[in-house]
């Protein structure tokens, strides 16, 4: 499929571009610099079948992102990206993460159907619980074995414990603290590590997750 990005330079308010069948819209002024070609290169990392659910990447000041303290979110065929972030590396990282969430729509059975990924995730949660207890942190077992997203647990990880402190605790267990949030975030965090960071550490610590990503590539 033909790509239509021909402009060079940074994304600006009012831009409406198309690349690899994805419409890129800049709704509001960006408080960071993002080169158009850098964004195009990230999109081109993926086989077309992996990005087929994404019709739009929209940059702007979105209430629903701000209220939930999200930098980006995938919803109904679009990736919404906050216009207020620290830099383009973080923005591109977030976009790849949300592409990971979009993949669940088409490949949910491949990723989750056999239950192997969920078992790997729960096992890691239990290992993390051991590390928490060493630090005097107690979380009810029913929360730690629940693979679904729990906003209270998310906030406890990010705000009460804090990701800087959690980073040391998850070493050798999760790729990053955010991967411990829920099963779906575990997958998207690994997707981001595999495609964007190209980090072989993921294969070492999360063999089931890595094998799912390899299988995904083979089927895309």
Q: Residue spans of the language-model regions?
A:
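Short alpha-helical catalytic segment bearing the HExxH-like zincin motif
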Residues: 90-98
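Zinc-dependent metalloendopeptidases
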Residues: 73-74, 79, 106, 119-124, ...
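Low-complexity, serine/threonine/proline-enriched polar segments
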Residues: 117, 121-165
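Non-catalytic architectural context of zinc metalloproteases
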Residues: 1-30, 57-63, 92, 158-171, ...
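A generic secondary-structure signal for well-formed alpha-helical elements
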Residues: 50, 103-107, 195, 199
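Pan-zinc metallopeptidase signature
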Residues: 150-220
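Auxiliary, metal-adjacent structural segments of Zn-dependent hydrolase domains
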Residues: 8-88, 113, 131-144
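Catalytic Zn2+-binding segment of zinc metalloproteases
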Residues: 99-119
């Amino acid at each position: 499929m033909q790509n239509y990005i021909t402009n060079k330079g940074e994304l600006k308010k009012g831009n409406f571009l198309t690349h690899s069948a994805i419409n890129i819209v800049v709704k509001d002024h960006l408080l960071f610099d993002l080169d158009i070609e850098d964004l195009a290169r990230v999109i081109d990392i993926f086989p077309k079948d992996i990005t087929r659910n994404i019709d739009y990447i929209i940059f702007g000041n979105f209430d629903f992102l701000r209220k939930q303290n999200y930098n980006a979110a995938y919803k109904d065929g679009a990736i919404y990206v906050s216009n207020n972030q620290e830099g383009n590396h973080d923005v591109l990282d977030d976009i790849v993460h949300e592409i990971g969430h979009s993949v669940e729509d088409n490949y949910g059975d491949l990723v989750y159907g056999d239950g192997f990924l969920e078992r790997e995730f729960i096992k890691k949660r239990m290992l993390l619980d051991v590390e928490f207890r060493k630090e005097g942190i107690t979380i009810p077992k029913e929360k730690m074995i629940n693979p679904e997203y729990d906003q209270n647990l998310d906030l406890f990880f990010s705000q009460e414990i804090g990701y800087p402190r959690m980073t040391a605790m998850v070493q050798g267990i999760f790729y990053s603290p955010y991967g411990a949030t829920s099963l779906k975030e575990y997958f998207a965090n690994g997707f981001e590590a595999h495609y964007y960071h190209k980090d072989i550490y993921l294969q070492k610590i999360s063999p089931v997750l890595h094998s799912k990503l390899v299988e995904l590539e083979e089927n895309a």
